[in-house]
Amino acid sequence: MTHVEVVATIAPQLSIEETLIQKINHRIDAIDVLELRIDQIENVTVDQVAEMITKLKVMQDSFKLLVTYRTKLQGGYGQFINDLYLNLISDLANINGIDMIDIEWQADIDIEKHQRIITHLQQYNKEVVISHHNFESTPPLDELQFIFFKMQKFNPEYVKLAVMPHNKNDVLNLLQAMSTFSDTMDCKVVGISMSKLGLISRTAQGVFGGALTYGCIGEPQAPGQIDVTDLKAQVTLY
């Protein structure tokens, strides 16, 4: 069984309000990584992100900071695509205080360009979470394994695969794919079966070799997320 870090996802609008800071502080013992979603901010700029990071850095000794721009293609709000998206991800490397950066994977990406950006982020001491999300369904087991395989070829620190289950076999397939690859990959693996049906993938992440599990602070930011306080309590049961 692997050690699991609990990620708390927040999605503020333009600024970090005092009420949000209070909510974070109230759950500080349950948070290992704070994920700052920025795709909900229309035409977000690096300067806006840097300003938010500055406010969060006051508490940063308590957790690592992960920045994520989730595109509409993968279930987020972000309108940036192609070079606009990749340029933003690349520019995040210049912000002090960011520990981890999410970058999306699709089957049709420009492999060389993606690899250059991932290497660039790592040169600035940012851990890379390469991720793929399917909010519609769970692909067959062999396809799940293939996605993990393709993502790990970029040599990131983490590979993350989140899919939507429609039955218990979908959940089992995701857990099996994660378990198999956690034994063979050099990088850390994250597998999430979304919605209430897949909740066990969040709470028993470490049993199946996963390294990160995602929860929320109040309002869920993805299907199946539960509050990080409850998530931390359940993760530690395993």
From Swiss-Prot:
InterPro entries assigned to the protein according to its UniProt record, in alphabetical order: Aldolase_TIM (IPR013785), DHquinase_I (IPR001381), Type-I_3-dehydroquinase (IPR050146)
Record key words, sorted: Amino-acid biosynthesis, Aromatic amino acid biosynthesis, Lyase, Schiff base
Classification via Pfam families: DHquinase_I
Sites where the protein binds 3-dehydroquinate: 35-37, 70, 202, 225
Functional pathway: Metabolic intermediate biosynthesis; chorismate biosynthesis; chorismate from D-erythrose 4-phosphate and phosphoenolpyruvate: step 3/7
Record's catalysed reaction(s): 3-dehydroquinate = 3-dehydroshikimate + H2O
Positions annotated as active site in the UniProt record: 133 (proton donor/acceptor), 160 (schiff-base intermediate with substrate)
Enzyme class (EC, first level): lyase
MF terms in GO: 3-dehydroquinate dehydratase activity
EC number annotated for this UniProt entry: 4.2.1.10
An individual GO BP term: chorismate biosynthetic process
Assembly: Homodimer.
Task performed by this protein: Involved in the third step of the chorismate pathway, which leads to the biosynthesis of aromatic amino acids. Catalyzes the cis-dehydration of 3-dehydroquinate (DHQ) and introduces the first double bond of the aromatic ring to yield 3-dehydroshikimate.
Stored HAMAP family: AroD
Family: Belongs to the type-I 3-dehydroquinase family.
Protein name, UniProt field: 3-dehydroquinate dehydratase
Native organism: Staphylococcus aureus (strain MSSA476)
Gene (UniProt): aroD
